[in-house]
Swiss-Prot record:
It is linked to Waardenburg syndrome 2D: WS2 is a genetically heterogeneous, autosomal dominant disorder characterized by sensorineural deafness, pigmentary disturbances, and absence of dystopia canthorum. The frequency of deafness is higher in WS2 than in WS1. Piebald trait: Autosomal dominant genetic developmental abnormality of pigmentation characterized by congenital patches of white skin and hair that lack melanocytes. InterPro entries: Snail/Krueppel_Znf, Znf_C2H2_sf, Znf_C2H2_type. Belongs to the snail C2H2-type zinc-finger protein family. Phosphorylated by GSK3B. Once phosphorylated, it becomes a target for ubiquitination. Expressed in most adult human tissues, including spleen, thymus, prostate, testis, ovary, small intestine, colon, heart, brain, placenta, lung, liver, skeletal muscle, kidney and pancreas. Not detected in peripheral blood leukocyte. Expressed in the dermis and in all layers of the epidermis, with high levels of expression in the basal layers (at protein level). Expressed in osteoblasts (at protein level). Expressed in mesenchymal stem cells (at protein level). Expressed in breast tumor cells (at protein level). This is Zinc finger protein SNAI2. It is found in: Nucleus; Cytoplasm. Its main location: nucleus. PANTHER family: ZINC FINGER PROTEIN, ZINC FINGER PROTEIN SNAI2.
């Protein structure tokens, strides 16, 4: 930084600031109007016109707060802060006043809410019940999650098949099902139709003799991948299909059926 911008300021460390010379400003906000004690008033038309609250009085002075109160008035137990003390509103009865000043009775719902707020244990003991299935929950969040299930079920659309009576929750599932009726994949060699393209490809290999899926354990090859997976089970050590007559085990159910149909082991 250039030296022309530097300002040298002498500070006297021995001189301490006198905080008693500073004025203290205490702002007191109260919903009550002390008519016998004249004070500056901040006009607030929206409050004064309603008639529900008295004008807001403001003290700005360096004297202590207790010295400002009129005779016969003492500070009430309110909310303490650095700005002063705010007196609480008077206790309310079972009736309330509207903006016109007339009394209107409190509804049953408001009275029930006030009684619950005064007793925290009443909220915990209350059961939240679903108005659709009468199922109860101990918390409101649990009831809200349960009602979401009702909303999802009601908003869920069902798509019906025009060829049969089946219904699906998604349009994509319905389109896949309709292909089983229309069979759009047709073999050009024999005219056989299929619902899926990969089924047609596996069928065409039966005409061409192509067997691209070979077994890594033996020299057998297959035209379809699913046939290879079934063949690999014969090389597995796990053989969970057992013959009831000779207790011989097999890795595939189809091999067990062939064994039973051959009649090699007849029960005596």
């Amino acid at each position: 930084m250039p030296r022309s911008f530097l300002v040298k300021k002498h500070f006297n460390a021995s001189k301490k600031p006198n905080y008693s010379e500073l004025d203290t400003h205490t702002v007191i906000i109260s919903p009550y109007l002390y008519e016998s004690y004249s004070m500056p008033v901040i006009p607030q038309p929206e409050i004064l016109s309603s008639g529900a609250y008295s004008p807001i009085t403001v003290w700005t002075t360096a004297a202590p707060f207790h010295a400002q109160l009129p005779n016969g008035l003492s500070p009430l137990s309110g909310y303490s802060s650095s700005l002063g003390r705010v007196s609480p509103p008077p206790p309310s009865d079972t009736s309330s006043k509207d903006h016109s000043g007339s009394e209107s009775p409190i509804s049953d719902e408001e009275e029930r809410l006030q009684s619950k707020l005064s007793d925290p244990h009443a909220i915990e003991a209350e059961k939240f019940q679903c108005n659709l299935c009468n199922k109860t929950y101990s918390t409101f969040s649990g009831l809200a999650k349960h009602k979401q299930l009702h909303c999802d079920a009601q908003s869920r659309k069902s798509f019906s098949c025009k060829y049969c009576d089946k219904e699906y929750v998604s349009l994509g599932a319905l389109k896949m099902h309709i292909r089983t009726h229309t069979l759009p994949c047709v073999c050009k060699i024999c005219g056989k139709a299929f619902s899926r393209p990969w089924l047609l490809q596996g069928h065409i290999r039966t005409h061409t003799g192509e067997k691209p899926f070979s077994c890594p354990h033996c020299n057998r090859a297959f035209a379809d991948r699913s046939n290879l997976r079934a063949h690999l089970q014969t090389h597995s050590d796990v053989k969970k299909y057992q013959c009831k007559n000779c207790s011989k085990t097999f890795s595939r159910m189809s091999l067990l059926h062939k064994h039973e149909e051959s009649g090699c082991c007849v029960a005596h």
